[in-house]
Design a protein with these regions (language model features):
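Aromatic-anchored, glycine/proline-accented short structural segments
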Residues: 84-135
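Core AdoMet radical
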Residues: 1-15, 19-84, 94-101, 124-127
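Short, small-residue-enriched loops and turns at beta-alpha junctions
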Residues: 7-12, 74, 102-107, 133-135, ...
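Auxiliary Fe-S-binding modules of radical SAM enzymes
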Residues: 119-261
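Catalytic cores of alpha/beta
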Residues: 41-50, 103-119, 183-195
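Surface-exposed amphipathic alpha-helices with a cationic face
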Residues: 18-28, 49, 85-90, 163-170, ...
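Conserved, mostly hydrophobic/aromatic
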Residues: 3, 58, 88, 118, ...
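Generic structural signal for well-ordered alpha-helices
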Residues: 17-22, 45, 82-85, 115, ...
């Protein structure tokens, strides 16, 4: 199970997150718990691990300082993001990272730098996402909207290429096929599986709340319950000539090799 939220660091939010993790661990002791709660301090990350969390996804978005400064508020720090990733590794998490592909101003050299950062960081799992424009973000100027529409197929293909290159660089890591790929093509995630991804994530968020979590426009899978999403995911894997591994935690082989030799 993946639990994702914004960066909430006040005491009540921390207690809320801890209570959820403890409840899941108590009721479903065999379930793997992945968290994506943004940058958090090391003591809280330790508490979450002790409560029962196994994995933590913290995307770098871009390892290039120039782009990172452009995409984030002034009080955000690339150095702090990297420190948090190191903290997660030191606490024994399966550590996930990732980037956004196709950003305005991003070059091929920038994407190569990201891949080298992933390799050198020795991460266990990855969430790579294509840039999908959202009208309520600072990047969504009329000029950028037109730019994105003209280059959407290029962004999609570059995402598949990065997945394939990452699979070659890190053959035993877990790589998610991002839901956002289905914005570009109905079989976008299936194409990602063929390119080298090996993880699909069905949404179990109640449909009544999915419209409140629109990270990008044209987001698929806003209707339907968890059971329907699960069946859809199985069909996608089968159409990519893969057999889904159901009922297992799906621990990254890279993590097992890294921690057990």
């Amino acid at each position: 199970m993946v639990l994702q939220a914004g960066v909430l660091s006040f005491p009540d939010a921390k207690e809320y997150f801890l209570a959820i993790v403890r409840s899941i661990r108590e009721r479903f002791p065999e379930m793997g718990i992945t968290l994506s709660l943004g940058e958090q301090d090391q003591p809280f990350l330790r508490e979450l691990k002790e409560a029962g969390a196994h994995r933590y996804l913290l995307r770098i978005e871009t390892s290039v300082p120039r782009l990172y400064r452009r995409l984030h508020p002034a009080n955000h720090s690339l150095a702090r993001r990297k420190k948090c990733l190191r903290d997660l590794r030191g606490l024994g998490y399966q550590v996930g990272c990732g980037n956004m592909i196709g950003l305005p101003g991003q070059t091929l050299d920038d994407m190569v730098d990201d891949l080298l950062f992933f390799r050198d960081g020795d991460f266990d799992m990855f969430g790579l996402g294509p840039y999908v424009i959202h009208r309520d973000t600072p990047l969504a100027t009329p000029r950028t909207v037109a730019w994105w529409e003209e280059r959407r197929e290029e962004i999609f293909q570059r995402t598949l290429n990065v997945i394939a290159l990452l699979r070659i660089l890190m053959p035993t890591c877990n790589i998610a096929a991002a839901t956002a790929l289905d914005v570009f093509h109905k079989d976008g995630r299936e194409q990602a599986l063929r390119a080298g991804a090996n993880v699909l994530m069905p949404s179990v968020t109640p449909s009544a709340y999915r419209h409140a979590y629109l990270l990008y426009q044209r987001k698929p899978c806003l209707d339907g319950d968890a059971e329907r999403c699960g069946r859809c995911i199985v069909r996608k894997a089968e159409r990519a000539n893969l057999r889904p591994a159901l009922g297992v935690q799906g621990t990254s082989l890279h993590f097992l090799h890294r921690t057990h030799g």
